[in-house]
């Protein structure tokens, strides 16, 4: 780093340390300075005299580390008994640690380029001068502590949490430079070193704090590489949230759980129309222990304020001294609450009761099968409000009592494993069952249980239904309830408990009623000729009254209890409530799942046979990687053998949690295209059975027709020869003629005589004779009909054998197939220059649609507050703007609590029941997003072999975006097909994408996807339609019955089917964040290449190759570079030549070769032709190669073909040779027959 001059640094002038070690007796020789030499010499002489005249024992040792250690060693063995009796002295205050080199360097640079941002005199963060901009984090509130900078108008960027403005001209010299170069290593900031690794900035935990937002991070040259916004505590280290630069583009790096490091503004609360900081409540009331009721009232007044939890913590922590944090602090809030008794539908033996362990809620959102159970007792807290993991407290009559936690039990069809407990909540892992029971044993050894109907079936993680976590396997994303008792974002509502009736407080004494309070506050009401009611804390006697005419209830406003629908709310306080945090939040984690045994695979002709060995039910799925995926899946429970057909496009098979297996067929066959006719027919029959049968049938018919024609001509000649003898009565045919014409020397019956005989004796044979000409006519017409198809096939094969297209310009355009992993070569011929070969290979192709979020949906939670029971009166509903809110008033209720009737009246009581819906706590992690998908943008990652270098570039395939490969420009796209696997509406759930026509926002249906909708997981706007209907409560019971449709989100999770990852055609791989389809093998991609002149080599500079010959010693077609060609040549000089196949059906692996003198080179090629005839160009010279290729031995391979796959196989030269021989032989026979006929006709005509 360059030295930055400064006048004063830590109140001293900076001087470099001398290079030589300091001697024992230091002789100071001043530097020669002409203007002050005399004065300095006098000062030095005076200083030396003072040192020499001072006594040696009085000289203090020099303050260095070595002398200090020696002095400590000498003083260690001295034992002074007097010193032991001295009282221990207080430790002197430690001096502030001196800043290190990194801190000093940053302070020098920060002195000019950063400014404090203040709010009401407090430093909230910092603003930094970088380049030509003033940058300040947007979340830092306040004004820059500089008159010029405070006047600037800032532009806000919510995406990067940054505000920027132009630096005033006179302050540009103070700004720091920035850089996008960030090699991994250590950087500097105000508090020391910052480590950059894996794309993240981290510091030791504790080195940064709120108030550091806006501080810059420097490299060793003093350039700003990032600006700090906040941090996320990750244990020993803290990951920084920063804004940085990547090639002049601003990017934001935000680790998970990052918090903003702006100094928090004080939050205000309200008490008696007076505001105060929520973290510092006023002294009246200031503490729950001193004034519990007033403190709870103050908390209820501020329950909706942002600083409520600060006020709650301050009110429950009365000691002004700073206390040591521990897990007990998480239980401190429970001293303001109490357990309670509530109605349970089944307390054992099928009867209901008011149970101390009533079940409130059972949550099963965790995908790992863990249940979160809420009960009415409290675990981990004793009756004295102290924390004890081994205890629980429950409500025994009007007062809490302690019991052992060891007596707690949870069971479904079998006992469950309890994994965590705190407060009202239990975590348990349970087997499947239809009911859930919780219970405990109280202090009197009495067992209490409560059973609820609950269908529990542990969900399946992954693709295998296993029962226990394996030791080795695969990590998959899942969710669970974190076993942490720390405060979370989840909360429950609490309120003051209602007055609890207790008939046992009243006794009848000779016409009077005595109320015994037992140290409690009792509210009583008697109707004995007049109204007699009030509150009492002492025993009271009601004269001339009976117990049936009185009502007594215990009132307690010193504690909160859970806002339960099984307990009425306090009639005096109405809707007043508080909130407390609850433990065990739902979080995304990873779960280890097993991997099924690899199947035994046997390859066959266009098929694979898999022998599967499942240890437990395992999912098998497969799809074709062509246009029609034909997806299929099944659960395999026992050993099974499966045979699957492998199409030409390939087959993808997924077995359990293993990675997918991919298979491609090869053109393997038992015959050969270069053998005898029956071997050739067998070869083509196994490859193309239909085509082979048609061609062989037509060829056989043609050959038989030719043979038949020859026979007919011979018969005609024979008839011409024997006719004269037949017409002559008694003529005898000469022996030679009878031998040649195969006739008897006597006269035979004529055709008409034979026909007359058949008509009279055998008519079926007569008609068969007549149908022969008609059948011949039909066969001939069919042959003429099939002749154009054969012509098209031959024309297609002829076109495929034409040489590769070349271009005579440096602007080259080519089209490559959209197939990942298959290299494609193109040849650029430019007049006057040596040919250039460009090799391109698609490494990935991404289709990313433009998405607009309509809403998110998740599981809903039905919120049912405690019912309001209006004794001796009528309650009224009020309108509330809550989702799916419902409110009803039921008359004629007579509710009972455990101590007796809740109300004094019999029939004039009313119950107000209300309920509404809100997003469940699991919506932060378990939700599905509904998107509208628009036009997809395509991008490609391309590997280019250019000028001997392999270079990988990424480009948008839109035909407009240009990328540079060395000195050449490549423009990719647009793609030939605008196809995308995404419909107009898609649903994204975690890492899966589904095409789904979901309902629009505000039109959800009960029990279906979208029954509850919200714009984002954090937004407060919620729409719900769950068919929530309140029902009349049962007589004598305090509860809020209701009817509601089941969660549409959970129903969709069960019935959603396979995602696009498994069902997308063309082998697409679907990914999220962002949503995209990767490597879809559909269509072609045009590429335009602009090659500069300097990239070409002139013909005069390139070697000249002559006397070329080609020999193919081995060739296996339809295999990955299974052909080998040896080319002999003579080169004019040593150099490098481009090698290229001029035939599209043949792909050569090498792009260029070294040539020198008389030598030979070996190239590898791949083709689908059985008889490959192609031309190879080396430099500017071409040579003809011919190969007789044999079929591959492997039926199935796990890689796609590296050559052009033809729809129809070519005809081998051997097959053509056999066709010529057979056709020539038959043709010769026809020619001989024709010659005989001509001679006979000529002779017969000459006689006439």
Curated annotation (Swiss-Prot):
Q: Name one GO biological process term.
A: proteolysis
Question: Which ranges are annotated Low complexity under compositional bias?
Answer: 22-44
Superkingdom of the organism of origin: Viruses
Q: Where is this region: Binding to the viral RNA?
A: 84-114
Q: What InterPro entries has UniProt attached to this entry?
A: Alpha_E1_glycop, Alpha_E2_glycop, Alpha_E3_glycop, Alphavir_E2_A, Alphavir_E2_B, Alphavir_E2_C, Flavivir/Alphavir_Ig-like_sf, Glycoprot_cen/dimer_sf
Name the top EC class: hydrolase
The reaction(s) catalysed by this protein are:
Autocatalytic release of the core protein from the N-terminus of the togavirus structural polyprotein by hydrolysis of a -Trp-|-Ser- bond
Basic residues: which segments have biased composition? Answer: 60-74, 84-101
Query: Where does the record place the site Involved in dimerization of the capsid protein?
Result: 187, 220
Q: Which residues form the active site?
A: 139, 161, 213
Q: Identify the stretch(es) annotated as Host transcription inhibition.
A: 36-68
UniProt PTM = Structural polyprotein: Specific enzymatic cleavages in vivo yield mature proteins. Capsid protein is auto-cleaved during polyprotein translation, unmasking a signal peptide at the N-terminus of the precursor of E3/E2. The remaining polyprotein is then targeted to the host endoplasmic reticulum, where host signal peptidase cleaves it into pE2, 6K and E1 proteins. pE2 is further processed to mature E3 and E2 by host furin in trans-Golgi vesicle.
Misc. comment: Belongs to the Old World alphaviruses that usually cause fever, maculopapular rash, arthralgia and myalgia.
> What protein name applies here?
Structural polyprotein
């Amino acid at each position: 780093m360059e030295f930055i001059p400064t006048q004063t640094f830590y109140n001293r002038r900076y001087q470099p340390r001398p290079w030589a070690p300091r001697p024992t007796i230091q002789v100071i020789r001043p530097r020669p300075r002409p203007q002050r030499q005399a004065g300095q010499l006098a000062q030095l002489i005076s200083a030396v005299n003072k040192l020499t005249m001072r006594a040696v024992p009085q000289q203090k040792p020099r303050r260095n580390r070595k002398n200090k250690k020696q002095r400590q060693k000498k003083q260690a063995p001295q034992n002074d008994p007097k010193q032991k009796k001295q009282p221990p002295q207080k430790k002197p205050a430690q001096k502030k640690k001196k800043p290190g080199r990194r801190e000093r360097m940053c302070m020098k640079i920060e002195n000019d380029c950063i400014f404090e941002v203040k709010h009401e005199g407090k430093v909230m963060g910092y603003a930094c001068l970088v380049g030509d901009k003033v940058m300040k984090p947007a979340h830092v509130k306040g004004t820059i502590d500089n008159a010029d900078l405070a006047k600037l108008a800032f532009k806000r960027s919510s995406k990067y949490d940054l505000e920027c403005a132009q630096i005033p001209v006179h302050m540009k010299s103070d700004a720091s430079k920035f850089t996008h170069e960030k090699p991994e290593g250590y950087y500097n900031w105000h508090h020391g070193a910052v480590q950059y690794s894996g794309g993240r900035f981290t510091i030791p935990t504790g080195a940064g704090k709120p108030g550091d937002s806006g501080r810059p991070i420097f490299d060793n040259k003093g350039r700003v590489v990032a600006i700090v916004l906040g941090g996320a505590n990750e244990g020993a280290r803290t990951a920084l949230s920063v804004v940085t630069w990547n090639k002049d583009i601003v990017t934001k790096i935000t680790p998970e759980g990052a918090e903003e490091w702006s100094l928090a503004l004080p939050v205000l609360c309200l008490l008696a129309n007076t505001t105060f900081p929520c973290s510092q409540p006023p002294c009246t009331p200031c503490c729950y222990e001193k004034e519990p009721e007033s403190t709870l009232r103050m908390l209820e007044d501020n329950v909706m304020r942002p600083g409520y939890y600060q006020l709650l913590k301050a009110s429950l922590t009365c000691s002004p001294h700073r206390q040591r944090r521990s897990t007990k602090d998480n239980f401190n809030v429970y001293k303001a609450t109490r357990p309670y008794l509530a109605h349970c539908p089944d307390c054992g033996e099928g009867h209901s009761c008011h149970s101390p362990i009533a079940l409130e809620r059972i949550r099963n959102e965790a995908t790992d099968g863990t249940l979160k159970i809420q009960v009415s007792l409290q675990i981990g807290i004793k009756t004295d409000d102290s924390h004890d993991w081994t205890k629980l407290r429950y409500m025994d009559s009007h007062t809490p009592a302690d019991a052992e936690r060891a007596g707690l039990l949870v069971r479904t069809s079998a006992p469950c494993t309890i994994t965590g407990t705190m407060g009202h909540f239990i975590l348990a892992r349970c087997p499947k069952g239809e009911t859930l029971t919780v219970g405990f044993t109280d202090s009197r050894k009495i067992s209490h249980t409560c059973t609820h109907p609950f269908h529990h079936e542990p969900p399946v993680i992954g693709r295998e239904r296993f029962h226990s976590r394996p030791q080795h396997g695969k990590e998959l994303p899942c969710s669970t309830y974190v076993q942490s008792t720390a405060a979370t974002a989840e909360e429950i509502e609490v309120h003051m408990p209602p007055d609890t009736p207790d008939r046992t407080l009243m006794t009848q004494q000779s016409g009077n009623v005595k109320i015994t309070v037992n140290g409690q506050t009792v509210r009583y009401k008697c109707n004995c000729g007049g109204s007699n009611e009030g509150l009492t804390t002492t025993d009271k006697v009601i004269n001339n009254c009976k117990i049936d005419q009185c009502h007594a209830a215990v009132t307690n406003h010193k504690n909160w209890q859970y806002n339960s629908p099984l307990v009425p709310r306090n009639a005096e306080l109405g809707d007043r409530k508080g909130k407390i945090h609850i433990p065990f939040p739902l979080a995304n984690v990873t779960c280890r799942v097993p991997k099924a045994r690899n199947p035994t695979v046997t390859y066959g002709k266009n098929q694979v046979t898999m022998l599967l060995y499942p240890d437990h039910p395992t999912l098998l799925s497969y799809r074709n990687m062509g246009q029609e995926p034909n997806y299929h899946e099944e659960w395999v429970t026992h050993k099974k053998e499966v045979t699957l057909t492998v199409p030409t496009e390939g087959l993808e098979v997924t077995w359990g949690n293993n990675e997918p297996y991919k298979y491609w067929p090869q053109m393997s066959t038992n015959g050969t295209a270069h053998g005898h006719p029956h071997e050739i027919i067998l070869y083509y029959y196994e490859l193309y059975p239909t085509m082979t049968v048609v061609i062989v049938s037509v060829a056989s018919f043609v050959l038989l027709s030719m043979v038949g024609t020859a026979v007919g001509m011979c018969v005609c000649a024979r008839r011409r020869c024997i006719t004269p003898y037949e017409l002559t009565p008694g003529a005898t045919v000469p022996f030679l003629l009878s031998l040649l014409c195969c006739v008897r020397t006597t006269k035979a019956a004529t055709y008409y005589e034979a026909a007359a005989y058949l008509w009279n004796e055998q008519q079926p044979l007569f008609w068969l004779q007549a149908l022969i000409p008609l059948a011949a006519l039909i066969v001939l017409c069919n042959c003429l009909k099939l002749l154009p198809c054969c012509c098209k096939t031959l024309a297609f094969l002829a076109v495929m054998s034409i040489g590769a297209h070349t271009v005579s310009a440096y602007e080259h355009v080519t089209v490559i197939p959209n197939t990942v992993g298959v290299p494609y070569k193109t040849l650029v011929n430019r007049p006057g220059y040596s040919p250039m070969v460009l090799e391109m290979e698609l490494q990935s192709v991404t289709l990313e649609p433009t998405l607009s979020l309509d809403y998110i949906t998740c599981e809903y939670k039905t919120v049912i507050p405690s019912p309001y029971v209006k004794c001796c009166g009528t309650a009224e509903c009020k309108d509330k703007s809550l989702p799916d809110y419902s409110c009803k008033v039921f008359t004629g209720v007579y509710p009972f609590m455990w101590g007796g009737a809740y109300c004094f009246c019999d029939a004039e009581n009313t119950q107000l029941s209300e309920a509404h819906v809100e997003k469940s706590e699991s919506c932060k992690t378990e939700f599905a997003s509904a998107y509208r998908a628009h036009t997809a943008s395509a991008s490609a990652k391309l590997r280019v072999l250019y000028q001997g270098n392999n270079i990988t570039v990424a480009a948008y395939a839109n035909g407009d975006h240009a990328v540079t490969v060395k000195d050449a420009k490549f423009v990719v796209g647009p793609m030939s097909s605008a196809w995308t696997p995404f419909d107009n509406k898609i649903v994204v759930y975690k890492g899966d994408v589904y095409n789904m026509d979901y309902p629009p926002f505000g039109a959800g249906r009960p029990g279906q996807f979208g029954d509850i909708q919200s714009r984002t997981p954090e937004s407060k706007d919620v729409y719900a339609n769950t068919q929530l209907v309140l029902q009349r409560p049962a007589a004598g019971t305090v509860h809020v019955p209701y009817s509601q449709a089941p969660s549409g989100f959970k129903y969709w999770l069960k019935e959603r089917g396979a995602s696009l990852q498994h069902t997308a055609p063309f082998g697409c791989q679907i990914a999220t964040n962002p949503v995209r389809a990767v490597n879809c093998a559909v269509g072609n991609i045009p590429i335009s290449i602009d090659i500069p002149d300097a990239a070409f080599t002139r013909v005069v500079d390139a070697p000249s190759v002559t006397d070329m010959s080609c020999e193919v010693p081995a060739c296996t077609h339809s295999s990955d570079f299974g052909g080998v060609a040896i080319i002999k040549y003579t080169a004019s000089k040593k150099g490098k030549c481009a090698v290229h196949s001029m035939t599209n059906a043949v792909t050569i692996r090498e792009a260029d070769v070294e040539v020198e003198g008389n030598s030979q080179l070996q190239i590898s090629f791949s083709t689908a032709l059985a008889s490959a005839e192609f031309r190879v160009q080396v430099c500017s010279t071409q040579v003809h190669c011919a190969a007789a290729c044999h079929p591959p031995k492997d039926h199935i391979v796990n890689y796609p073909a590296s050559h052009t796959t033809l729809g129809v196989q070519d005809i081998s030269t051997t097959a053509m040779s056999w066709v010529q021989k057979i056709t020539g032989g038959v043709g010769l026979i026809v020619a001989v027959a024709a010659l005989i006929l001509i001679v006979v006709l000529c002779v017969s005509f000459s006689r006439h």
